[in-house]
């Protein structure tokens, strides 16, 4: 089912048989997250938390990362990464690979600092995200999703070897920046019972869960994935980092082909498991956010709300991280009219 109890957690750890020749990632510390919070203050928005207007008795809150300057949480990690990149970044430039949001965030930060930026994006990236990347001055390199995923797993792209690669989710600077969201959630709702986080590569989940584990370990953290690509749920079920078949959908910001082993090692001790939602549930959440709260969220951003509404993350105080709002207006119109694809 993609969940773990405390006993199941022990079993999963003992059963995991991950390959030894893989990248390793040191756990992020609360000090790194707090330093990132100070470092990016003034560069990013401290986003509000509002209650979801719903007819249910559930107490659901929305952490509105869609209000960030580039429309997603990625600007936090990108700001932290650029600040820590070193003096050579000016001459070498930076690049990343992204479905759109990371590329926008890095391009925006690079532009603020006079740094050249390139973005490797999948050839089916939403036009809204492509326009924003261009507006921020980055060079776009469109390739197949498989080629993007190859850059994700190898951390390199031959034609850009002279530039500094900033990984979209397994870079410690990115994860620490993401963790600042967890600090803010606990500052605003200290008695929160659970937090639901969209899971793409794991950097957002790892950062937020680390902050919450350190500051309020009784609060539970859940990931959410779409049914069209749920490698984390498969990994929890099997006890090791798994690769799954990925079906493209309007939920383009989350749902990869696999969980990188280094991210699996980091995330699995920190969260309860992954809630898998159908495209219909996520589309309904997109509509609900618009109709009840006047909030525009992309599929990935609305997935956390869809997961919370299932009740699987608990029925007390639940905070949903609305990770982004970069959705094509045409696609939003289709979803609002009841079309799901």
List each language-model region with its residue ranges.
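PLP-dependent amino-acid enzyme catalytic core
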Residues: 3, 13-341
């Amino acid at each position: 089912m993609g969940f773990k109890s405390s006993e199941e957690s022990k079993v999963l750890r003992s059963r995991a048989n991950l390959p030894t020749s893989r990248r390793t990632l040191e756990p992020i510390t609360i000090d790194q997250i707090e330093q990132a919070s100070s470092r990016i203050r003034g560069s990013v928005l401290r986003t509000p938390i509002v209650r979801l207007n719903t007819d249910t008795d559930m107490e659901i809150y929305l952490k509105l990362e869609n209000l960030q300057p580039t429309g997603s949480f990625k600007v936090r990690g990108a700001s932290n990464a650029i600040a820590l990149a070193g003096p050579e970044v000016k001459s070498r430039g930076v690049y990343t690979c992204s479905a759109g949001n990371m590329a926008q965030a890095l391009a925006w930060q690079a532009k603020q600092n006079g740094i050249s930026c390139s973005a490797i994006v999948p050839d089916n990236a939403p036009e809204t995200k492509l326009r924003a990347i261009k507006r921020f001055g980055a060079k776009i390199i469109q390739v197949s999703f498989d080629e993007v995923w190859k850059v994700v797993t190898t951390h390199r792209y031959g034609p850009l070897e002279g530039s500094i690669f900033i990984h979209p989710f397994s870079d410690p600077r990115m994860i620490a920046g993401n963790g600042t969201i967890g600090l803010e959630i606990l500052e605003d709702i200290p008695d929160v019972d659970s937090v639901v986080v969209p899971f793409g590569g794991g950097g957002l989940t790892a950062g937020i869960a680390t902050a919450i584990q350190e500051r309020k370990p009784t609060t539970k953290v859940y990931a959410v994935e779409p049914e069209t690509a749920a490698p984390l749920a498969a990994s929890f079920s099997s006890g090791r980092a798994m690769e799954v078949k990925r079906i493209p959908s309007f939920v383009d910001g989350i749902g990869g082909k696999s969980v990188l082993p280094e991210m699996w090692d980091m995330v699995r001790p920190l969260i309860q498991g992954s809630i898998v939602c159908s495209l219909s549930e996520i589309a309904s959440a997109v509509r609900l956010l618009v109709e009840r709260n006047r909030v525009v969220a992309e599929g990935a951003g609305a997935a956390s709300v869809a997961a919370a509404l299932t009740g699987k993350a608990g029925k007390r105080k639940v905070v949903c991280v609305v990770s982004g709002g970069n959705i094509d207006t045409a696609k939003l119109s289709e979803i609002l009219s009841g079309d799901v694809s």
